[in-house]
């Protein structure tokens, strides 16, 4: 079995900017480990501490940390007969979650990638099963739905959006558009402004496993399923123009 600081099944990773802490979710042991980045880089014997044990209460499979009482994340709601993924607020201390109730009428099994921007009071849900993006304010109130050219209210058996990031005043999402069960993964990025207007598409040409926004250097960092595992795009050069 795993030791007290070993990770059984790694989950999401969140960043506490103020404390320079990484919060690493261990789905296997149902806890969050705290790694102080400064100590981790300077102490070869450094071991993480346990930030939170969450037992059987709902917890986000991905989240954006603001403080111990407020994070925004995506949650998987499961029951014997259903599976639904939705976004919402999360209090890490109490375990309380305020989830978005809205589900598009065409969507019976909601699967989403989420991104949030406190600066622009915007939360984005990008649908994995439909060519659909839903924009909310931070209170979870629907602002608009954005339908892409491959929208089909009956579903088309394809995987659509995979990951999302809000980069300044732009929404950047990775997109597949191929068979749900047999595809080569997301290889393109769609770019929208913060209100959901389409701006452009970028063909990366390599499978994008994950992406995030480096605000300090104004660039998108990508993890690729390729010989080159990491790459970045300059926001001003490729996205803003």
Language-model features: where?
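Eukaryotic scaffold repeat domains enriched in small/polar residues
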Residues: 1-241
């Amino acid at each position: 079995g795993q030791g007290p600081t070993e990770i059984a099944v790694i989950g999401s990773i969140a960043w506490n900017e103020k404390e320079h802490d990484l919060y690493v979710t261990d789905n296997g042991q149902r806890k969050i480990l705290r790694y102080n980045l400064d100590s981790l880089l300077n102490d070869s014997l450094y071991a993480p501490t346990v930030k939170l044990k969450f037992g059987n209460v709902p917890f986000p499979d991905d989240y954006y940390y603001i403080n111990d009482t407020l994070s925004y994340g995506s949650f998987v709601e499961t029951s014997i007969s259903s599976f639904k993924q939705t976004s919402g607020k999360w209090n890490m201390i109490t375990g309380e979650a305020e989830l978005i109730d809205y589900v598009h009428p065409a969507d019976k099994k909601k699967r989403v990638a989420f991104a949030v921007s406190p600066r622009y009071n915007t939360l984005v849900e990008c649908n994995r099963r439909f060519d659909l993006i839903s924009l909310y304010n931070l209170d979870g109130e629907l602002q608009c739905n954005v339908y892409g050219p491959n929208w089909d209210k009956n579903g088309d058996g394809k995987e659509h959006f995979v990951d999302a990031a809000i980069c300044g005043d732009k929404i950047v999402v990775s997109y597949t558009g191929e068979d749900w069960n047999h595809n080569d993964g997301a290889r393109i990025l769609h770019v929208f402004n913060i209100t959901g207007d389409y701006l452009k598409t970028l063909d990366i040409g390599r499978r994008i496993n994950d992406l995030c926004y480096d605000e300090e250097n104004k660039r998108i960092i990508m993890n690729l399923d390729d010989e080159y595992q990491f790459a970045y795009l300059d926001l001003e050069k490729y996205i803003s123009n």
